Amino acid sequence: MNLNFTSPLHPASSQRPTSFFIEDILLHKPKPLREVAPDHFASSLASRVPLLDYGYPLMPTPTLLTPHAHHPLHKGDHHHPYFLTTSGMPVPALFPHPQHAELPGKHCRRRKARTVFSDSQLSGLEKRFEIQRYLSTPERVELATALSLSETQVKTWFQNRRMKHKKQLRKSQDEPKAADGPESPEGSPRAPEGAPADARLSLPAGAFVLTEPEDEVDIGDEGELSSGPHVL
């Protein structure tokens, strides 16, 4: 049985008869792809994008680009895609970088510039500090105007100067104590190092303490053993 069908309306030379045999189906070759130049990418694409037979564009395999020569922190507002097709069509990245990358340490607290006072300003501040340690608001404004400073600068300077003055006083008070050492005040009896602490505290004026080794004991008047220091 022959299953070949031919159309009577068209000549045999213009159209190949359709066959449903397995051999004819396996030997059938697909139609070649049509190339259509895109309109909106005509200026940027170097080559044409091939289209499938049903009209959808055939996208070639994306190729990974090498890293940009410039650091991503210094890039402009334009965005460089990570992938480009072989025809030059950009493909957006899955995880794009933020538009404005933060610099390391951006949120660190910036240190304020240190105020530099002139010699005349320092002299005026020191003279006022010797007279008065604390200033009221009107006094600060008056002094700041006289020295061509701001009220905040005068207030900050007086705070730092008071802290410095307190440290100097504390240091001057600690130096005599370090020079004297652990000696007792003049006029008070000093007990030997081996005497107990309670004996040292309860000594009368002018008393002298004798200390003996711990293995030696004395016999009292009533025949009892007694140890420890004896006060003469």
Curated annotation (Swiss-Prot):
| Keyword terms, alphabetized | Activator, Cytoplasm, DNA-binding, Homeobox, Nucleus, Transcription, Transcription regulation
Q: Which residues bind DNA?
A: 108-168
Task: Name the tissues where it is expressed.
Answer: Expressed in brain. In brain, it is restricted to a few specific developing brain structures such as pineal gland, telencephalic septum, hypothalamic pre-mammillary body and arcuate nucleus.
What protein am I looking at?
Brain-specific homeobox protein homolog
Please tell me the species this chain comes from.
Mus musculus (Mouse)
Could you tell me where the Basic residues compositional bias lies? 161-170
Give the GO molecular function terms.
Answer: DNA-binding transcription activator activity, RNA polymerase II-specific; DNA-binding transcription factor activity; DNA-binding transcription factor activity, RNA polymerase II-specific; RNA polymerase II cis-regulatory region sequence-specific DNA binding; sequence-specific DNA binding; sequence-specific double-stranded DNA binding
Protein family according to the UniProt entry: Belongs to the distal-less homeobox family.
The lineage is: Eukaryota, Metazoa, Chordata, Craniata, Vertebrata
Q: Which PANTHER family match?
A: BRAIN-SPECIFIC HOMEOBOX, HOMEO BOX HB9 LIKE A-RELATED
Q: What biological process terms from GO does the record include?
A: brain development; eating behavior; locomotory behavior; mammary gland involution; positive regulation of transcription by RNA polymerase II
Encoding gene per record: Bsx
User: Domain of life here?
Assistant: Eukaryota
Positions of the region Disordered? Answer: 160-232
The entry's function note states:
DNA binding protein that function as transcriptional activator. Is essential for normal postnatal growth and nursing. Is an essential factor for neuronal neuropeptide Y and agouti-related peptide function and locomotory behavior in the control of energy balance.
Note the effect listed for R109G.
Abolishes the nuclear localization
Q: Where is the composition biased (Basic and acidic residues)?
A: 171-180
Recorded hits in Pfam families, A to Z, give: Homeodomain (PF00046)
- List the biased-composition ranges (Acidic residues): 212-224
